[in-house]
Amino acid sequence: MKDAYLYVVEKSVAWEFDSPEYGRLARKIVELLYERKEDLTDDRIAILLNISTAETRRILQYLMKLNLIGVRKKTTEDYRIEYAWYVDDEIIRQAISSRARVVREKLSMLIRSLTEGAYYICPSCFIRYSLDEAVNWGGTCPICGTQLEYVENVEEINKLTKIFEKLEKL
């Protein structure tokens, strides 16, 4: 489960900041937090990983927004508010179950739409069209002009249903 969590962290950050490097950096931050099993401030994380504090804060705040890491607020002796970040097994479990729930909802909608309608696909550019779209375009692909082919959804629905059932077990 930890590997799936790290994958989600890396890809989410890479996608948000349009930078695979930021994704790898987020993965390092989360691995550090998980391995140390303690709350660390953003300054301490930046020092341990030898990266800028600004980048660290940016990544940590984004991960917090996605509920992929935990944060605790502390007041220092001089009455400053300091944030301490952590990752534990409960955070990982919640993150994975949350993602699984979102995927289950989307799969459910996709399975429902596939069972309720007929679909056609362009054999050249592999774009799927509903029956209404295929009729509107006269049975040809509007992009390349190739004749659209009817898609038998039974196999696809069965595959999606199996994936849905696996996700329900998480």
Swiss-Prot record:
One of its GO terms (molecular function) is DNA binding. It comes from the Archaea. One of its GO terms (biological process) is transcription initiation at RNA polymerase II promoter. SUPFAM superfamilies: Winged helix' DNA-binding domain (SSF46785). The keyword tRNA-binding does not apply. PROSITE patterns: HTH_TFE_IIE. InterPro entries: TF_E_archaea, TFIIE/TFIIEa_HTH, TFIIE_asu, TFIIEa/SarR/Rpc3_HTH_dom, WH-like_DNA-bd_sf, WH_DNA-bd_sf. Residues 1-93 form the HTH TFE/IIEalpha-type domain. Keywords: DNA-binding, Transcription, Transcription regulation. It holds the Pfam family TFIIE_alpha. Transcription factor that plays a role in the activation of archaeal genes transcribed by RNA polymerase. Facilitates transcription initiation by enhancing TATA-box recognition by TATA-box-binding protein (Tbp), and transcription factor B (Tfb) and RNA polymerase recruitment. Not absolutely required for transcription in vitro, but particularly important in cases where Tbp or Tfb function is not optimal. It dynamically alters the nucleic acid-binding properties of RNA polymerases by stabilizing the initiation complex and destabilizing elongation complexes. The winged helix domain is involved in binding to DNA in the preinitiation complex. Belongs to the TFE family. Monomer. Interaction with RNA polymerase subunits RpoF and RpoE is necessary for Tfe stimulatory transcription activity. Able to interact with Tbp and RNA polymerase in the absence of DNA promoter. Interacts both with the preinitiation and elongation complexes. HAMAP family: TFE_arch (MF_01909). This is Transcription factor E. It comes from Pyrobaculum arsenaticum (strain DSM 13514 / JCM 11321 / PZ6). The gene is tfe.
